[in-house]
């Protein structure tokens, strides 16, 4: 990982203290098929960590018209209402201890977006965050981190900015997900365009703590050097896929070190 020391289990155990951050809007549930733990356990760990707001934002069920495509990393369409009921029941149960919000992490697929918003609005979500994993849409199988052609990075940035311009998204999760397998010129040009576009729209960029925890290529210091130069605001997103992630403060400390080194503006107050 660029800019971060490798994290081991021993290090994570050593730094399992309360978090400095008070608001987290990036939390998954087992419905997405790659997270663990009951919804209630996430809430209990968030309270122990000292969070004031826990936003659930599981991978939204997506309506793909006229296709047999099956997603292996998001909740099922028929789980939409059960998810919302579960999160809002916890919101009521723990109202004296923590604010709980019901949201979704969602890709922007231009051809399907209007229909998808109509579908999700059945449960009146509190917010959406954009987590753009595919270029075009999932049916194209163009998974962003596996691309290396410059035109693919250009397409990713254009699609993200078009989605952010809808005004439907609270912030952009893991903005540097495509990585750096492109030419240096394309990386500088397109990530600058992404940062400038997000700043113009006043949309924060997420420093993804799961990426630090799992030693992924993101968040990248190289990307956030560009964000610092452009003047973007950033937020921390735990991207919790297990209740224990909400008590793991070591990735947060590493992220804060980078923020201070680069002079980034960290939004520490509530976004909603």
For each of these PLM feature ranges, what is it?
Residues 13-110, 120, 181-195, 202, ...:
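An N-terminally biased module of ancient metal coordination in phosphate/nucleic-acid-related enzymes
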Residues 39-52, 111-125, 156-167, 193-196, ...:
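Short amphipathic alpha-helices and their capping/turn segments at secondary-structure boundaries
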Residues 98-143:
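Hydrophobic alpha-helical segments and helix pairs
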Residues 129-230:
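Domain-core and long-helix interface of multi-subunit machines
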Residues 249-272:
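Mid-to-C-terminal alpha-helical segments outside catalytic/metal-binding sites
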């Amino acid at each position: 990982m660029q800019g971060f020391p490798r994290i081991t289990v021993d290090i994570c155990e050593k730094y399992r203290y309360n978090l400095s951050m008070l608001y987290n809007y990036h939390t998954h549930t087992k419905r997405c098929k790659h997270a663990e733990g009951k919804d209630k356990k996430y809430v209990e760990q968030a309270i122990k960590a000292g969070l004031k707001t826990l936003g659930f934002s599981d991978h939204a069920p997506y309506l793909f018209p006229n296709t047999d495509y099956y997603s292996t990393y998001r909740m099922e369409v028929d789980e939409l209402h059960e998810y919302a009921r579960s999160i809002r029941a916890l919101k009521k149960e723990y109202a004296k201890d923590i604010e709980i919000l019901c949201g979704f992490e969602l890709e922007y697929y231009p051809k399907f977006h209007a229909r998808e918003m109509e579908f999700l609005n059945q449960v009146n979500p509190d917010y959406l965050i954009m987590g753009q994993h595919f270029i075009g849409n999932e049916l194209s199988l163009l998974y962003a981190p596996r691309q290396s052609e410059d035109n693919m990075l250009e397409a990713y940035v254009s699609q993200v900015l078009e989605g952010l311009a809808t005004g439907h998204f609270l912030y952009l999760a893991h903005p540097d997900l495509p990585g750096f397998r492109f030419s240096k010129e394309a990386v500088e040009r397109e990530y600058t365009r992404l940062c400038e576009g997000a700043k113009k729209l006043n949309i924060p960029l997420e420093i993804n703590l799961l990426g630090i925890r799992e030693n992924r290529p993101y968040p990248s210091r190289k990307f956030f050097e560009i964000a610092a130069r452009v003047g973007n605001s950033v937020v921390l997103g735990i991207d919790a896929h297990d209740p224990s992630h909400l008590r793991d403060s070591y990735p947060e400390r590493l992220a804060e070190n980078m923020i201070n080194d680069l002079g980034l503006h960290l939004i520490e107050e509530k976004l909603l």
